[in-house]
């Protein structure tokens, strides 16, 4: 299990993560929709996740969402690296009604994000552009490559939830055990 605490003038965050868990979660960020997405991420990846964030949500949700992405990415990095005996590459499409988002992952130590979801609009009081900020922070701190590609959908909630669930399933698959040593022709990740 990895535990990380991070405190800035904008947020105070505690994350506990067990990558080989059962999908249990205890999430409290003060941002209801974001909590719901993190619960989906834990459930469908199979990791146990606790997140507590006391952020300056009176300003807006940006610092909370971005900083949780940073800390969660660091926790995932600590749980997974050095990389060996995993599948490494995976993808998934977890549909939600009319919405479908494809996520392709490489747990290869090279941070890169291709993000192709709608950025405009609100889900209640949650700004759609924050989804990209979360994944950018997570991907770069986890040191993975991720392509998050919008395929179809009209309901913003469904599109974002499809993205989180697809990321979770792809992550579970990429981290699945494979007797391969270091999954790289370079011999190091």
Swiss-Prot record:
InterPro entries found in the cross-reference section: IGPD_sf, ImidazoleglycerolP_deHydtase, ImidazoleglycerP_deHydtase_CS, Ribosomal_Su5_D2-typ_SF
Pfam families per the UniProt record, alphabetical: IGPD
UniProt KW Cytoplasm keyword: yes
Gene3D superfamilies hit by this protein: Imidazole glycerol phosphate dehydratase, domain 1 (3.30.230.40)
Keyword annotations from UniProtKB, A to Z: Amino-acid biosynthesis, Cytoplasm, Histidine biosynthesis, Lyase
Segments passing through the bilayer: none
Ribonucleoprotein recorded as keyword: no
Localization terms from the record: Cytoplasm
GO MF entries: imidazoleglycerol-phosphate dehydratase activity
Entry GO terms, CC: cytoplasm
Involved pathway(s): Amino-acid biosynthesis; L-histidine biosynthesis; L-histidine from 5-phospho-alpha-D-ribose 1-diphosphate: step 6/9
Enzyme nomenclature, EC number: 4.2.1.19
Catalytic reaction equation(s): D-erythro-1-(imidazol-4-yl)glycerol 3-phosphate = 3-(imidazol-4-yl)-2-oxopropyl phosphate + H2O
GO BP: any one term: L-histidine biosynthetic process
Top-level EC class as recorded in UniProt: lyase
Family: Belongs to the imidazoleglycerol-phosphate dehydratase family.
Protein name (Swiss-Prot/TrEMBL): Imidazoleglycerol-phosphate dehydratase
Gene: hisB
């Amino acid at each position: 299990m990895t535990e990380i605490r991070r405190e800035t003038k904008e947020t105070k965050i505690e994350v506990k993560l067990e990558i080989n868990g059962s999908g249990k979660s205890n999430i409290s960020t003060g941002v209801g929709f974001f909590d719901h997405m993190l619960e989906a991420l834990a459930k469908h990846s199979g990791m146990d996740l606790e997140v507590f964030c006391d952020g300056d949500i009176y300003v807006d949700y940006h610092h909370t969402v971005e900083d949780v992405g940073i800390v969660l990415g660091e926790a995932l990095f600590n749980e997974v690296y050095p990389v060996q005996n995993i599948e490494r590459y995976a993808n998934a499409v977890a549909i939600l009604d009319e919405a479908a988002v494809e996520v392709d992952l490489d747990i290869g130590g090279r941070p890169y994000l291709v993000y192709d979801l709608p950025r405009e609009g609100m889900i209640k009081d949650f700004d759609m552009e924050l989804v990209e900020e979360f994944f950018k922070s997570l991907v770069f701190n986890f040191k993975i490559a991720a392509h998050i590609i919008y395929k179809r959908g009209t309901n913003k909630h469904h599109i974002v939830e499809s993205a989180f669930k697809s990321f979770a399933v792809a992550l579970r698959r990429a981290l699945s055990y494979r007797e391969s040593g270091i999954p790289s022709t370079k011999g190091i990740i």
